[in-house]
Amino acid sequence: MGKRVLAGGVFDILHPGHVAFLEEARKIAGKNGELVVVVARDETVRRLKRTPIVPEEQRVRMVSALKPVDRAILGHPRDFSITLKTVKPDVVVLGPDQDIDEKEVERWAERAGVDCEVRRIEKYERCPLDSTIKIVKRVIELWKRGELRV
């Protein structure tokens, strides 16, 4: 029997790291399980990280088109426990580079009345452009060298 797995992130510029994370989350869900991906709202990204490059509606559309994903939703802008209460996952999966602490997710789940396991994916195959910031830096580098044309 499969599990309902919740994975989340910004997914601003999709890259192989995102795909590897979601493939691992899918494995945890199992063949008959469900992978629900919560995409951070623009407001949340601005508050916690930076200004998003790609608007939330486009990010959730791109994530929903990925093969491992059964359903992609926008998260609650201020309270992750509301998202947990809505989705009711069996497992919440965190990526290796996500700054959130597992214990904090457990507290949110408890507040939401959701009994779920929290797992962190420790590693996945790394590649040179496996983060949004690395991609942005590469674009800037190519632009400065005159190798990109608009």
Swiss-Prot record:
<dbReference type="InterPro" id="IPR004821">
    <property type="entry name" value="Cyt_trans-like"/>
</dbReference>
<dbReference type="GO" id="GO:0003919">
    <property type="term" value="F:FMN adenylyltransferase activity"/>
</dbReference>
<dbReference type="GO" id="GO:0006747">
    <property type="term" value="P:FAD biosynthetic process"/>
</dbReference>
<comment type="subunit">
    <text>Homodimer.</text>
</comment>
<comment type="pathway">
    <text>Cofactor biosynthesis; FAD biosynthesis; FAD from FMN: step 1/1.</text>
</comment>
<dbReference type="Pfam" id="PF01467">
    <property type="entry name" value="CTP_transf_like"/>
</dbReference>
<keyword id="KW-0548">Nucleotidyltransferase</keyword>
<feature type="binding site">
    <location>
        <position position="97"/>
    </location>
    <ligand>
        <name>ATP</name>
    </ligand>
</feature>
<feature type="binding site">
    <location>
        <begin position="10"/>
        <end position="11"/>
    </location>
    <ligand>
        <name>ATP</name>
    </ligand>
</feature>
<dbReference type="GO" id="GO:0005524">
    <property type="term" value="F:ATP binding"/>
</dbReference>
<keyword id="KW-0067">ATP-binding</keyword>
<feature type="binding site">
    <location>
        <position position="124"/>
    </location>
    <ligand>
        <name>ATP</name>
    </ligand>
</feature>
<comment type="similarity">
    <text>Belongs to the archaeal FAD synthase family.</text>
</comment>
<keyword id="KW-0547">Nucleotide-binding</keyword>
<keyword id="KW-0288">FMN</keyword>
<keyword id="KW-0274">FAD</keyword>
<protein>
    <recommendedName>
        <fullName>FAD synthase</fullName>
        <ecNumber>2.7.7.2</ecNumber>
    </recommendedName>
</protein>
<feature type="binding site">
    <location>
        <begin position="15"/>
        <end position="18"/>
    </location>
    <ligand>
        <name>ATP</name>
    </ligand>
</feature>
<comment type="function">
    <text>Catalyzes the transfer of the AMP portion of ATP to flavin mononucleotide (FMN) to produce flavin adenine dinucleotide (FAD) coenzyme.</text>
</comment>
<keyword id="KW-0285">Flavoprotein</keyword>
<dbReference type="InterPro" id="IPR024902">
    <property type="entry name" value="FAD_synth_RibL"/>
</dbReference>
<dbReference type="InterPro" id="IPR014729">
    <property type="entry name" value="Rossmann-like_a/b/a_fold"/>
</dbReference>
<dbReference type="InterPro" id="IPR050385">
    <property type="entry name" value="Archaeal_FAD_synthase"/>
</dbReference>
<keyword id="KW-0808">Transferase</keyword>
<dbReference type="GO" id="GO:0046444">
    <property type="term" value="P:FMN metabolic process"/>
</dbReference>
